[in-house]
Amino acid sequence: MKFKKKNIYWVSPTKGVESMGCGLVKEFPCKDIGSIIDKITPNVSTIINLMEGVYRGNFSYLMTNFVILFKGEGRDKTIIDLEGRQRFTLCTISDIHFKDLTIKNGFGNAISGIFDGGAIYAYDSQIHFVNVALIDNTCSASGGGIFLYNCYFNVEHSLFQNNTANSGGGFILLLSASNITNSSFLHNRVFQEGKGGAIQVFISFMSIELSLFAYNIAPYSGAIDMVGGNLTSKYSKFIENHSNIGGGFGLYFISNVIFESCEFIGNRANSTGGLSFLTAQSMLRFSLCIFKDNFAPNCGIVESHSISPLLFESCSFTGDVPTAVQIALYDNYCFLKVQNCHFSEIQGVLMYADSISNIIIDSSSFTNVSNRIIDVGNEADILIISSTFYNITIDEYLVSLSNGNFLAYNMDFNNNIVLALIKSSVGGSVTIVSSSMSNNYVSTSLISLSNGYSVYIENCEVKNNTGLFKGCFIDTDHTGSETIVQSLFENNRSPFGPILYFSNPETMLSTNYSSNFRDILFSNNFAAYSGALVYFSQNVSLPNISCTNCIYDNNTAVFGELVNSAFYSFNVSITPVIYPFQDLIIEIFALDFFGNLVRGTSDLGFFAIPCSDAYVEGNLFAVLNENGSAIFSNIKLSSNPNSICNLTFLSVPIVSENGPITIPITFSYCSQDRELVMIKSIYYCLKTIKVTSFVKFLVGTLAAILLIILIISGFISLKYRKKRVIRYSNPLFLCIILVGCIIFLITIPVLFGSTSATCKIRFPIIVIGSCLVTSSVFIKQFRIWRLIKDIQLLRETNVENKYLLKFISILMVIPIIIVICSFFIFPTHEKYTFNQRDITITHYCSDGSYLAYVIIFLVYQMAILLFGCYLVIVCRKFRSIPGTFNEATYIGILIYNYTVVLIVAIPLAYVFNKNPLANFLIFSISIIVFVLSTIILLFIPKFHFLLRKKVIISSLEKLIKEQEAIVQRNKDILYFYDMYLAEERTGIQQQQRQGNLYNNNSLGRSISSNTRKRSNNNINNNNNNNSFNMTGFSDSSSTISNPNLTSFTSSPSSLNSSSDSDSTPDFNDPNFLEYYNERVKNYGKRKSIEKNKINNSIPNSPKSTTSLPTSLPSSSSSSSSSSSSSSSSSSSSSSSSSITPKSNTPILSPSSQSSKTINKGGSGSGNSSSIPNYQNIKSPNTPKSNKSSPNLSIPVNKNSKVSKLSSNQISSPKSIKSDKSPITIKDFDNSSDLSDSSNSLKSDSSIGSEQFNEKVINRIFNIHQDKKVKTTKQQSDSTLSSIGSDSSPNFNENINNPNINPNNNNNPNNNNNNNNNNNNNNNNNNNINNNNNNANNNNSDTDDSSPNFNENIEKKNVVKTKTNFLNQFHQKKQKDSDNRKNYNISPINISDEKVPPLSPINLSKRK
């Protein structure tokens, strides 16, 4: 506004003065505005320049016909503070302008209810605000900042903030006009029940542009309240205004409001109309607006009660704020149009109408909404044109109408997961044209219709939709009509009826409507249960479905056809004739209206109601399964045979259209494998439990095979009864065993069934068969034990048939008594037991005394067999010689087997007596094992021995060769030991020349008690070898030839001691001592004879030959006697071998040496020690004739732990220890100084060339010299160790022949053996005499000894150097090598390891 003629005044609260001439110039301003107002002339334009400062004082100016411009220097500089007690002005018919200033803290009281406004009250005036701030003004009535009545109010770039009133917090416009541009209304407030937190308009016109309304609060209409008038708002924002109703604005009484390009964000209402509330024909239009997060519990955006249109054009709706409805139409004839809008992420029902309303949606899109889009009722009409619904996931219907009409054209429903797209009820009509529905997941169907409807579908595509629970496209109760033309249905899936799903109507409306299809293509539609296209649920009325020009392509249902219905009727399948208590299987088939099975469902059940005179057991209710049938299983009916019972069947919860079904059942007699039994007035047909035919056939076949084997075994035993292997086993014994086994096998067919006859004879047969076998075997084992005992006591050992039969008769007394009692006195009878649960009956054999029979029989058998086991243990160490049949071993195993079988079988058979199959298998398997073990252990080995005689002889020959190798190996080891005892031999030879060799007292002292005891045991064992044994045998005609052996004869001795037994004679035994003394007395007499024989056999023996002793010590005599005894017994009782060397072969024999007494350092007496000497006697002039050559006999005894050599050949150096010699065998065994040397000696078990490590010999020589020096200092106090002492090993145990038997002459069974022994003794005595003669000749030339190893070591004064020692050793070994070549025995290879001990010769070893 321009002032042509104006008055200008200046006012300054700080520089102004109070004078008459003030204010006319800027330099002399007035201090108070009121002084200027008094000077102003009405209707004269006046400018009042308000200089910087805060103006306070008394205002409330009354201005009429004033034209004034209040101009300040800025809103922050020029401030009019009304101090909360006054208004600034009350103006009428004036034109007041405010610019660049702030008016605050105004307060207005209503004057007679007319004058309101906290800062300004204007009437018939014009008020202009330019860059004005109206702040913190309050009015007790209306218009917290300004009240305008019939005024024009222009606002530019101004601020209304924190103004309060009972209504119109910012200002009130009454019958006025206002233009607001670029202004802000912030935090204005209305109290009590007022309206319009920022502006209240009464029948006025207002235009708002580029303004902001934010955070204004009022009970109603949070920002703008409009009662009549027009409001146009452009490019403005309404943000977070708050009220109870109409959070942004409220329109009442024919208001017309247009918002263009506005934003409505976060406006809230406590009740409804979060953004706007419309009543009374108010029209609201939004164009290009944005709605976001507006909220109210009932209606979030607009609630309309106006019949005027509500229009949304090109708007966007977003916001995830929970609310019931976004846009609501509550009055009749409301109209809503949504055009080209986009809705996304909206909660609550988007559009709701509960009355006769019209909703039009044109070219809009809906996505990601969380509730229904349209929900209308009461004849509301919905028109959707060219709109899309996609990516919506809700558990609601997208469009729901009740008694309304739905029309859609060019609509797309894609990728939605909803309860249904369209829900129409109560007479609704649905018309869809040229639309598409694809890739949707629906819980019920795409279109759900009920309670009177009509649906028309034309030119639509329904593809790839999935129905989750019912159908897929249309779900209807068949109370309306369906018309579908020129459409495509492809790849739709649902459990039932993908195209049409007819459910049961909820009302009594007629279902006589038609379903018409024309020009339809049905392709690849699929039903997971029934109805590939159409399905009728629950009760079905007469369907009237027609399809004209329809094409069906690959439409399938898992449990149905193209058209199926729910349950309609059922049929019953049952056996009309049954026997009492038969397992009855009843099957019911559920059918649909079209006669197809109702499959794929289990919501139907059936009851069976029996007749009153029959007994019923089982479940009388069955549930329909997926294959369309219900089965009653485990039902048992029982009644008197030839009676009839009626069974009635009915369905629940759906009653069949045909009603219940009754079927008669006839009872017959039992079948062949069952027995009729009445228990507690109930008839049962019980199944007989018995052994299956297959088991009978299998076990019977095995028994027959065993019977054939037994017969063949008996035939072979009789045919070869004169053979020693059969004869020694006693053919009668074998026949009794065969008879017992055959009787035992007869039990198996008796066990096939339990009848009175089989029960009576079953137990006696078992007792007789088993006792015959076990008693015979026990008597055999007992006789073996007695045989061993008789041999030890030198009694009669022959076994006679009479003896066998006598004891079998004795042992069979108790079994015969048991048989008589169980067969005649208290026989077992057939009994039975039944199982009502399994409907079975079991026959078994039992009696009151049955358990007593079993216990007595078991105790008796166990007593015999356990005693037999004891006898087996006692006799376990007795084994047969190689090449003989050891029957005792097999008898022992057989007794063990019988014991185990009877211990296991009898108790188990009693426990399972009432189980036919188990009882039969236990008995049958036990009998088969019993008989089979008897055949395997008693007959097969004998037949095998008969057929494999040559193989056994070859095995023996190989065994003897191995023993020869061990003998030669022991000889070489003894040679090695002799090298370190050579020094001691010189002293011993001197003692021999003094005649101390025959000192019996020293010999007696040298023999240990343990040696004597072991010798006595071996004597007894050898007595057993000389005895006859019926359990062991060998072929007397078989002779094993060997190039190195003269002869080998097997003897039938089989009960020999084990290989672990000792063979040294016991010198404490009086029998042995008496025999020993007798041999010593006769030794002198034989000496001359032996000397002559030796001279005759070696006439040209040179003097240089090593001399043999002229006489032997007691130990040598004893050994000679033992050797003689062993040689004599080798032909009759034990296996021995004789090696006959060639004519020029040197003879290996021990040199008899006398003991020598050594006194050193005074009168102390020395101890005597006897050390044998082992030499190879080379006789180059010995004739080649075998008769004149002395024989080297190596008797072999299988009882000894090591090889047994006669004392004429080998004496042990291990039992000799001299105080003069620093090295003994004991030293080698125990000395730590020699441990390295011992460990460096290595023995090779193979027979090859002999080698020695000189490093080992050097170490041994050095240790020998060191120990000699040490022992020389202790010679005066040392004593000689006795021969065979307990502290050192006694080699006499290994070489003493244990075959000396002083009681041989007293045994009448051994007369022949004694004669043979005497002959052998004579031969051995001749050999001894020859050896003694050689020894005498050699002794006579001892001083003139030949240059051999012994002559060199006799020179005491010669210093023994290492070189001499090695030379002597090599000379000695060279002679040994030559001797072995003459005997055809390869030398032993001795390497750097420890020298092994003497290896035992064990003839008990067998392949």
Swiss-Prot record:
Q: Where is the composition biased (Basic and acidic residues)?
A: 1084-1093
User: What processes does the entry annotate via GO biological process terms?
Assistant: gamma-aminobutyric acid signaling pathway
* GO-annotated molecular function: G protein-coupled GABA receptor activity
Composition skew (Polar residues), residue ranges: 991-1004, 1030-1040
Coiled-coil segments = 1315-1344
Q: Tell me where the PbH1 repeats sit in this chain.
A: 93-118, 129-150, 254-279, 452-476
> Would you tell me the protein name for this molecule?
Metabotropic glutamate receptor-like protein P
